[in-house]
């Protein structure tokens, strides 16, 4: 019997991806950036030894993930949280990780670190984003979890876990700290050498994003992007 997936990557429709970047990047550029970070997340998951599943309704994403398990979104469900809660029923029952698809610096090591942060059952570990989101969550087990993604989701997930009697831990490894939603996020990525050398960083440099950031006054404290 095939093993059930234990890491879930939700992926929005590519034509709807990165809406907060639509005044900064063209649709084609936003799609390319999304695919770039998705490939980075998939690679990290596979190298860390997870059985990866993609949650999506996008045919192009399904084609891209042809060698992975695909859980198709259900039309009758509304919003990301309902889709994730439903998808968890099709996955492993003892331990699951949920990871955003837009983490440009994620590594296998950071996912293993997330896993090691939970040394007991009935626990949740949240990798917090710099703006208070939940970039990655380990659920051990997932049966007590209800997704609350959106603004401030890290605090919401943490508080819900405590209320449910679970052990809750928040970590902030640099590889899981940054997701790409806004021009400011692109600036944060391109302000570091490791960010510029990432696949997403290389693509952004290729399309002159640094010049665009400077023109839009997205500068760091050194006056550089």
Residue ranges and their predicted role:
Residues 1-21:
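N-terminal nucleotide-binding beta1-loop-alpha1 segment
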Residues 49-71:
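Acidic donor-binding segment of Leloir-type glycosyltransferases
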Residues 99-101:
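Active-site acidic Asp-centered loop
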Residues 106-132:
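Conserved donor-nucleotide/metal-binding helix-loop-beta segment in metal-dependent transferases, i.e.
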């Amino acid at each position: 019997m095939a093993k059930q997936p234990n890491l879930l990557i939700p992926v929005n429709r590519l034509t709807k991806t990165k809406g907060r970047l639509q005044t900064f990047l063209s649709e084609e550029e936003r799609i390319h950036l999304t695919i770039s970070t998705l490939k980075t997340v998939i690679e990290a998951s596979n190298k860390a030894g997870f059985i990866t599943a993609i949650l999506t309704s996008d045919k192009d994403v399904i084609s891209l993930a042809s060698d992975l398990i695909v859980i198709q979104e259900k039309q009758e469900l509304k919003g990301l949280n309902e889709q994730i809660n439903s998808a968890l029923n099709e996955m492993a029952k003892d331990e699951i990780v949920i990871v955003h698809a837009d983490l440009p610096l994620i590594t296998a090591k950071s996912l293993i670190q997330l896993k090691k942060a939970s040394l007991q059952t009935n626990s949740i570990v949240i990798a917090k984003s710099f703006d208070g989101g939940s970039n990655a969550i380990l659920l051990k087990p997932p049966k007590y979890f209800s997704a609350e993604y959106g603004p401030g989701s890290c605090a919401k997930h943490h508080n819900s876990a405590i209320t449910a009697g679970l052990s809750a831990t928040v970590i902030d490894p640099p590889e899981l700290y940054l997701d790409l939603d806004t021009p400011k996020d692109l600036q944060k990525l391109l302000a570091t050498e490791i960010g510029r050398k990432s696949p997403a960083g290389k693509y952004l440099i290729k399309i002159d994003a640094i010049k665009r950031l400077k023109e839009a006054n997205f500068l760091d404290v050194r006056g550089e992007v």
